[in-house]
Amino acid sequence: MTALNTYRRWLARVEDDALRAELSALDEVRDAAQIEDRFYRDLAFGTGGLRGVLGAGTNRMNVYVVRRATQGLAAYLKAAGLPLRCAIAYDSRIGSARFARETARVLAANGVTAYLYPRLEPTPALSWAVRYYGCGAGVCVTASHNPAAYNGYKVYGPDGCQITLEAADAVSKHIRAADHFDGVRLCSFADALADGTIRMIGEDCLEAFLDAVERRSVWDGDRSALRVVYTPLNGTGRECVTRILRRIGVTDVTLVPEQAWPDGSFPTCPYPNPEERAALERGLALARKTRADLLLGTDPDCDRMGAAVPDGEDYRLLTGNEMGVLLFDYLCRRRSENGTMPARPVAVTTIVSTDMADAVAAHYGVELRRTLTGFKFIGEQIGELERAGETERYLFGFEESYGYLSGPHVRDKDAVNAALLCCEMAAWYRTQGMTLAQAMDALYEKFGYYRNELQSVVLSGEDGMERMSAILTALRAAPPHTLAGERVTRVRDYLSGLDGLPASDVLELRTAHTKVIVRPSGTEPKLKLYYSAHARTMAEAAALCAAARRDMSARLGE
């Protein structure tokens, strides 16, 4: 069916008033390009579930797309013989609460018991609920840190991890088999609530989650003197983060007022990503005013955490790699000192995260495992330990994109856990007369200076994906002989499935002091290049990264 015919069918069948008005406002001639974009395909479903711009159309996030995806998920649970129970959480985004309720209605109509959080909660609380109730799946309605125009639908497996590629393919097939209008079962929310096929998640589940997070503490000293500024960036983090901080005695917490309450329009922060300085500007201003020891920011679904710390006359933003290394070293040091370091400890990070983690791991005798990009792969490593009866070996996992997890209580990155650890670590270093900036500099002195940078190359136009593929093919066929003035000594092609990892379209180039990893975005025509350099000073490491970037940009024609 053509995009135009699909548009006409939706115009005739859509009952939602807002979506009907949106479709009615389109003119078949004047708005032909927009109709094509809205209806030329179904919104893609992958390991990250669905994510797209809100609006009417098969290529948009709306109630009909969500219902159809849920119908496919219900069919998958039955076909796979998984428990017919599904936990549901949602964030502060536009439409999230409604999408969560519609998800519950479709599940209940298909005989799947839906456990729904009664209010917005962090993504890690969803991962926890899946395991708490023994569910076959979980759904979190969120688009993470995308702009306000987006929403999404993340699916989790029975282990509390985002679903595998194989599971995503199976769910996708069931979704494609269901018609948006005639192929979806739906029941009354009130009736399903009355008969128990929809159940509201109780406070006992959330309390148990916070208990599990609190048990990740590795120091019981006084934290009351720590002064913290916190911004949930108008997302889900306020309640859980402030509750966990109160539990461990961090009581001097000032919220950024304009960003304290849920608001899916993100009025003060168009791109609510704690990796970006712009997202933390209001927090930085308040931190300067209150002379805070620490600024924390969590993204809308509270699975990523950014931080800034005093450094001289101003504040310094710690990168995801720096925070990962700080937390890793702190956990190793504290658990070694208090006698709780497990035998044969395991830490996990991704292939694009800093090599400094290897130096920390070697120093403390920790086995460091590296996975493909995406925290679900870190969660899978915890699952492997669990199946071997060795869950206690898991010490810490992190990725460069601001995701951290210090326990097996959930299987996704957890900013509630990260906030607890970061505050505790800052309080502990305070007793040593050090700020976190000074602590990071001390680690650089101890392990060497590591610089990490990310470059995104957007290949616009209709042939963007093809050009991206051609660039990677050319790099594989003829990789550069030198980078940053050094000979390339190693080329690793993850397409062949290196180190026991699944085959992935990733290429790694190494010299004596520099590393470049190239991979496609996966969802858009964008190449991502991760630069890493190790040197005697940060200036030298930065110069190596800059030189490698110039070389690769020239190779890519940038």
For every predicted segment, state its role:
Residues 39-59, 143-146, 232-244, 300, ...:
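Conserved phosphate/anionic-ligand binding catalytic regions in large, soluble enzymes, centered on
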Residues 10, 14, 18, 34-43, ...:
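Gly/Ser/Thr-enriched, mixed-charge loops and adjacent short helices
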Residues 5-103, 198-226, 236:
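An N-terminal, well-structured beta->alpha segment
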Residues 288, 292-294, 314, 334-519, ...:
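Phosphate-binding and adjacent anionic-ligand microenvironments
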Residues 97-102, 127-131, 149-155, 176, ...:
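Short acidic, glycine/serine/threonine-rich loops at helix termini
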Residues 87-150, 247-307:
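N-terminal small/polar loop signature for handling phosphorylated ligands or for N-terminal nucleophile
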